């Protein structure tokens, strides 16, 4: 029997980066807000206390704060003709499952998207014409420009205490910053990180080629900081253990260090943990949401009525809930019709590893996004004529903290196991670093998300199925980027070089990034998008879908800052426009 609860005004499904912002901003209206989170509550002072915060087995290898794949996972295949199989262990990406979501174990890379990223299709056609379009490309403009969202980027940066140096301040290029970034209305709230030895070597070589290195924006505090919500964070001490871990020093911005504790001050807000939402419930004509159904910690089915439902969980869960709820037309890649599940994209990654006899880097000292980058090859910052691809990559020397299990690098030709491998691992731990080529990914017809016809979760519901492989565009992009990285690496002058290109076929096994996007793309046309520019469902106007699921394709830059900015943007649209007169906003 389903338990029916008293109605509330607004339900937010997922209390991570996006959901926490939406709960906080909407709680100020005085309406009854309920945040539903399927994971457990985290107490950073307990769960991430030293020395336990540096337990790599617990957090990285055993996935303590990540999604429980024994209860729900996804299935994967490269092509439509193949049978998809379940992902049984964390591999290519790491969705979170706790209050704060993936925002608890992220690496604190806090880059904005480029203006080009929001208008990929129109700008590509304007500059290069139709002959430059990738094969089977489904990429599209967002329906939202960089200029429209700039103030919300600024708002989120000041909530998360991002450190950096402006490169384009109100149209004036600033020394020390990224000259290719979109215009900023003001400086970062925190100063840029200090450059490491590896970063200095990279910067010197890049400058000799006429490139413009800068320090990557970071949400690991470069100085003590109190944010817009009066939450105070300490300064990063470069202790490493950022990716896959919480921060023992309370220096990494996350939903639990910047937003969620302030929600306790709002008596009209309630957080419910261990609530696994299984569908959005619709009225008899399917045009209005009347609430959600979830499974609680005791296995009971609960219906929570609400006037407004906001899906703010991870890309996969947002898309799956839309499919399970019958909101929007599922995408059919054969007919190239439908929208839900369309435009799934990822990011490309490649690197050049450098090994030295005469240089020591102490890589155990590092911090979130402690990185020196160049954007000369990012987005459309260079002429793509004749290259055979669109988009680009940023090149970076990263000093994020080399953990003892995951961060073992050995020179090419080293045996994969045994005494010689051990000797090489010990000898080279302190004497290597890599130049990474972080590339974008265009959406295309054969890459999509749908419901698996065979496999089900612990509640008997179909798993999400991913069909994905690299396209020719991504292969060419990554090959170009790794050649540019190799040029810089050779100037640095290592004793040995190891080139690690993009795999010919995408594999879900090795970790790459937790930057999965699309499936509920935003846009100006209901025929090619799930949500409008305010992230409001075209089909069910009292449902908003906020997160990286809204990206129509992926930038080379990490998505978290854009997810946060979109949450701030949507919160304002709901407060200022929708609540006064509930209706389609576009």
Model-derived segments and spans:
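A short, basic/flexible loop-to-alpha-helix module at the beginning of a structural domain
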Residues: 1-7
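A conserved FAD-binding loop/helix module that cradles the flavin
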Residues: 553-571
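N-terminal Rossmann-like FAD-binding beta1-loop-alpha1 element of flavoenzymes
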Residues: 8-35
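FAD cofactor-binding and catalytic pocket of flavoenzymes
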Residues: 78-113, 117-126, 133, 142-146, ...
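A glycine-rich dinucleotide-binding beta-alpha-beta segment and adjacent secondary-structure elements
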Residues: 216-222, 238-242, 278-283, 430-441, ...
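Residue-level detector of alpha-helix initiation sites
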Residues: 12, 16-17, 193, 197, ...
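Conserved redox-cofactor binding core of oxidoreductases
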Residues: 59-77, 84-92, 97, 109, ...
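Glycine-rich loop(s) and the adjacent beta-strand/alpha-helix scaffold that form part
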Residues: 28, 32-35, 39-58, 266, ...
